[in-house]
């Protein structure tokens, strides 16, 4: 039986949240599965987070399919904080939309994808009232940040359900190609994270 888990992280914003910049921090991790929605304060505050990372690791490793939007970004962040994280399979909704749109839009945004499917759009408050004004993630009130992240995760999950149906009802070769590209994404994430000895 498939156990799907939807993931989203929120980070500090230096270089667009670059996970390879030591200046950045992982602020929150949000997860959604059949057990419901959970969010975890990692470095949003200064509270200890080791136990939370262990819980996240257990939840992620128990899933058979990890869903996200531009999921390689989220995986880089999890790998930075969690050693030896085992991910069985991923579904990148951004990659799926690129394939389903016949590669006409290489980097569709979550908001554009939500709008395309007639779903509730992202909450603009965090971007417009905080990030665009130079206010970093740790300075955003928790209730606003938590609501923003939850809406992103719920929206990503809704997009996944629509995309899955579209793939299942469409050309099976396209679906197989997408699954293969998701496997490739995991390998690419590993290569980018580990680097190369030259």
Regions found by a protein language model. Give the residues of each.
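Residues at beta-strand starts and edge strands
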Residues: 3-5, 25, 185
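Conserved catalytic palm subdomain of right-hand nucleotidyl-transferase polymerases, strongest
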Residues: 6-7, 91-94, 198
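Structural beta-strand/beta-sheet cores of well-ordered domains, especially the beta-sheet scaffolds
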Residues: 5, 27-29, 194
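Extended, well-ordered alpha-helical scaffold/bundle regions in very large, multi-domain proteins
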Residues: 176-198
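Active-site-proximal helix-loop-helix substrate-binding element of RNase H-like nuclease domains
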Residues: 15, 24-168, 180-181, 188
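Non-catalytic accessory segments adjacent to catalytic cores
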Residues: 168-171, 175
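Long, highly charged low-complexity segments
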Residues: 1-17, 55-56
């Amino acid at each position: 039986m498939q156990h799907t888990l939807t993931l989203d992280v929120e980070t500090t914003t230096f270089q667009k949240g670059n996970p390879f910049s030591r200046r950045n921090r992982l602020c929150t991790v949000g997860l959604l599965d059949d057990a419901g929605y959970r969010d975890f304060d990692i470095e949003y505050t200064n509270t200890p987070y080791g136990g939370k990372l262990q819980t996240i690791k257990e939840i992620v490793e128990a899933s058979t399919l990890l869903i996200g939007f531009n999921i390689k970004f989220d995986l880089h962040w999890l790998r930075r904080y969690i050693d030896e994280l085992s991910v069985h399979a991923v579904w990148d909704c951004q990659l799926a939309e690129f394939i389903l749109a016949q590669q006409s839009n290489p980097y569709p945004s979550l908001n554009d994808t939500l709008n395309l499917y007639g779903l509730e759009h992202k909450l603009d408050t965090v971007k417009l009232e905080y990030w665009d004004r130079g206010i970093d993630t740790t300075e955003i009130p928790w209730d606003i940040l938590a609501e923003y992240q939850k809406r992103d995760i719920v929206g990503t999950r809704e997009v996944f359900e629509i995309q899955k149906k579209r793939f299942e009802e469409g050309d099976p070769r396209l679906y197989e190609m997408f699954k293969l590209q998701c496997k490739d994404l995991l390998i690419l994430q590993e290569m980018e994270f580990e680097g190369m000895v030259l």
